[in-house]
Amino acid sequence: YYRKTKDLINEAPVAGLSGFADMGKQNIGSLKNTGVEVTLGFKPIQTKDWFWSIDYNFTYNKNEITDLSGVSEGGLPVLTGSNIDQSNKVLAHQKGYAANSFYVYQQVYDKNGRPIEGCVVDRNGDGDITEADRYLYKNIAAPVTMGLSSRLEYKNWDFSFTLRASIGNYVYNNFDQTMRLTSENAIWAQNAYLPNRPLNTLYWKSDHNTSKITDMFVQNASFLKCDNITLGYSFNNLFVKGFSGRVYATASNVFTITKYDGLDPEVVSGIDNNIYPRPFSFIFGLNLNF
């Protein structure tokens, strides 16, 4: 498929002379989506006592901003989304890039591959670290999503499960960055967590933030989740004719396989502020028909 959307609404800078806030909702541009969707269904077994069905779906989608007329001066990114602290945003739109890309500094690492706290690349080579050294890196949307469900029946028994995968989505681990901030209350612990930063570089009796918005905190949040597993048993003419039903047990949010460092890789906003994790649940149920 191919789809182009125009007059998209997003927050954009407003002229100071307007008398309104410095940001406001505007129709700022156009976006195109290209991709493919595939759905497959199989029934490998269909006999008197056995029945087995498998359903699979696959989606690939790529989006790209094609226009940001009137708000992107000189092709600079348009910041969007919520603040990750009191004043900074980490998501941005720019023509030629995917929507909601991460706008970050490039982290510097030592010879052992460990990040040097507060040290980022001077990308424009002017000798100063400014906003101009930030760049667009990855985005929050997964280009590939997949789903797999299956149901197996044997006489009165039934068993089913649902799996879901998201591949290529990224999350800004803001909780990880926040834990690296330096303050007078936490200064004693810094050598334990940051062995590559000398103690004499810290400021005593003051809040001093050396942590920056870098690509180190933009983490691959691809995942495979088992949304539910159900086991059931159906009965007919129990005790009296016409009295039927089904008893079942369902487990939800069974497991998650991911390399993401946070509690849950499925962060819709793309910014992880230590979200409340989805709980595992177990349900017993009984359906009666008479």
What residues fall within each predicted segment?
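Outer-membrane beta-barrel and related beta-rich outer-membrane complex signature
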Residues: 8-13, 60-83, 169-192, 196, ...
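Flexible, solvent-exposed coil segments and beta strand-coil junctions
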Residues: 11-23, 123-131, 202-215, 261-268
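C-terminal beta-signal and terminal closure region of outer-membrane beta-barrel proteins
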Residues: 25-33, 79-114, 186, 192, ...
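Membrane-embedded beta-barrel scaffold of Gram-negative outer-membrane proteins
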Residues: 1-19, 50-54, 59
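Transmembrane beta-barrel outer-membrane domains
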Residues: 29-33, 139-143, 219-226, 275-279
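Extracytoplasmic gating/loop element in the C-terminal half of outer-membrane beta-barrel translocons
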Residues: 166-251
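Membrane-embedded beta-strands that build the outer-membrane beta-barrel scaffold
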Residues: 34-44, 52-60, 146-152, 157-165, ...
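Conserved small-residue
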Residues: 26-32, 36, 43-140, 259
